[in-house]
């Protein structure tokens, strides 16, 4: 059983330290055990130089086998067959070291490809990089799959299409066929064999495919009733908008002004939202400073009074905003959900001079 690296808090006893130094000096066990031993000694406070003087393992070699042993442990924990583990111990520390840039789930299948294709460290390095680049693509290319072999085959196919030199193109085609895992990927590469003498054609670019990662990036369109002073009938007559999934499609049947708002929680909770505009010095609690316009979001569905909210009420046919300690006699037109000030720009001229903007 290959030993597990100890935690940084673990301290070797003098007897354990001597035993590890002696085992490494005589290179007992496999390279995996050497890597675990070097890591245990380093975690116990022994420098790489001291380990070199005691065992003959140079600093660079210590680093490689320590990292490779960690890769081996992650592969072993994936439940792979024993023959693959035996291949890794073969020794293949240089091969496993190149797989360090992959995730734990990728390392096991990458090691299987290394075993099946008899890859050396340079081939393993190319495989790992191809897998990383393939994973960054916005979508899986046509005819290829997520298998690591197809990832290398895709890189070879793409490079071969751009090569004019016949020898280079032939070499890349052979490489792609060697690694292609799926039948569709192999067919894609074999198509290049039918016309080796022609100039490479430019492949169609990938679609600019994106997906929203955060709900707050999706704006919500809210109908606008107007600015105060405003007739109550005007506020109530603005038709509500219906948004259709999955892209919040809005169909406006009448001439209605709209304003976009972020998908904040208090905006999303509105059952029948409408926007009005007002001035900071005319709010129920005036805001100090220079007067400026504000956007006020009302929910016309919320007409039940509570003493924790501000409301818009009908005052002789006009919209009036206020807070009420008790239920008002006037008709409640809607609850105030949001009062938003405009974005503050310190120096608008700076926006027109890119060289003055901060990095």
Curated annotation (Swiss-Prot):
Taxonomically, the superkingdom here is: Bacteria
Q: Per the record, which residues fall in region C-terminal beta-sheet?
A: 219-345
Q: GO terms for CC?
A: cytoplasm
In this chain, the stretch annotated as N-terminal alpha-helix covers 12-195
Q: Which GO terms describe its biological process?
A: carbon fixation; photosynthesis; ribulose bisphosphate carboxylase complex assembly
**Keyword field:** Carbon dioxide fixation, Chaperone, Cytoplasm, Photosynthesis
Which InterPro entries does the entry mention? RAF1 (IPR037494), Raf1_C (IPR040858), Raf1_cyn (IPR046382), Raf1_HTH (IPR040781), Raf1_N (IPR041358)
Query: Where primarily located?
Result: cytoplasm
Kindly list the places in or outside the cell where this protein is found, as annotated in its UniProt entry.
Cytoplasm
Q: Which PANTHER family match?
A: RUBISCO ACCUMULATION FACTOR 1
This protein's domain notes: Has 3 domains, the N-terminal alpha-helical domain, an extended flexible linker and the C-terminal beta-sheet domain. The 2 C-terminal beta-sheet domains are swapped and pack against each other to form the dimer interface.
Note the subunit structure.
Answer: Homodimer. Forms an RbcL(8)-Raf1(8) complex. Forms complexes of many stoichiometries with RbcL with and without RbcS. RbcX and Raf1 can bind simultaneously to RbcL.
Function according to Swiss-Prot or TrEMBL: A major RuBisCO chaperone. Acts after GroEL-GroES chaperonin to fold and/or assemble the large subunit of RuBisCO (ccbL, rbcL). Cooperates with RbcX in RbcL folding, plays the major role in assembly of dimers into RbcL(8)-Raf1(8) intermediate complexes. RbcS replaces Raf1, leading to holoenzyme formation. Raf1 and RbcX are probably functionally redundant; it has been suggested they may cooperate.
> According to its UniProt record, which protein family does this protein belong to?
Belongs to the RAF family.
Name under which the protein is recorded: RuBisCO accumulation factor 1
What is the organism of origin for this protein? Picosynechococcus sp. (strain ATCC 27264 / PCC 7002 / PR-6) (Agmenellum quadruplicatum)
The record's gene field reads raf1
């Amino acid at each position: 059983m290959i030993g597990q690296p100890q935690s940084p808090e673990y301290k070797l006893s003098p007897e354990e330290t001597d035993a590890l130094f002696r085992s490494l000096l005589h290179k007992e066990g496999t390279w995996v055990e050497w890597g675990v031993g070097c890591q245990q000694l380093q975690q116990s406070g022994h420098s790489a130089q001291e380990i070199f003087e005691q065992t003959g393992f140079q600093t660079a070699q210590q680093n490689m086998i320590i990292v490779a042993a960690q890769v081996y442990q992650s592969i072993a924990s994936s439940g792979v067959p024993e023959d693959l583990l035996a291949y890794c111990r073969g020794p293949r520390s240089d091969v496993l070291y190149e797989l360090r840039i992959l995730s734990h789930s990728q390392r096991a299948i990458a090691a299987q490809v290394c075993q099946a294709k008899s890859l050396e460290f340079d081939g393993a390095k190319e495989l790992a990089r191809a897998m990383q680049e393939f994973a960054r693509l916005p979508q899986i290319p046509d005819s290829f799959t997520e298998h690591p072999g197809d990832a290398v085959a895709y890189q070879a196919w793409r490079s071969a299409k751009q090569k004019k030199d016949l020898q280079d193109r032939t070499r890349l085609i052979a490489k792609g066929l060697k690694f292609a895992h799926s039948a569709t990927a192999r067919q894609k590469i074999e198509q290049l064999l039918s016309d080796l003498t022609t100039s490479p054609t430019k492949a169609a670019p990938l679609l600019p495919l994106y997906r929203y990662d955060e709900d707050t990036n999706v704006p919500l369109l809210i109908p606008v009733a107007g600015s105060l002073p405003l007739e109550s009938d005007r506020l109530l007559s603005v038709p509500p908008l219906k948004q259709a999934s999955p892209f919040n499609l809005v169909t406006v049947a009448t001439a209605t002004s709209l304003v976009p708002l972020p998908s904040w929680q208090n905006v999303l909770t509105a059952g029948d939202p409408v926007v009005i505009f007002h001035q900071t010095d005319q709010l129920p609690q005036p805001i100090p400073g220079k007067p400026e316009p504000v956007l006020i979001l009302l929910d016309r569905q919320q007409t039940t009074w509570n003493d924790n909210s501000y409301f818009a009420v009908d005052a002789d046919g006009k919209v009036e905003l206020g807070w009420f300690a008790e239920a008002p006699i006037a008709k409640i037109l809607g609850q105030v959900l949001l009062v938003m000030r405009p974005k503050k720009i310190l120096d608008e001229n700076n926006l027109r001079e890119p060289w003055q903007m901060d990095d």
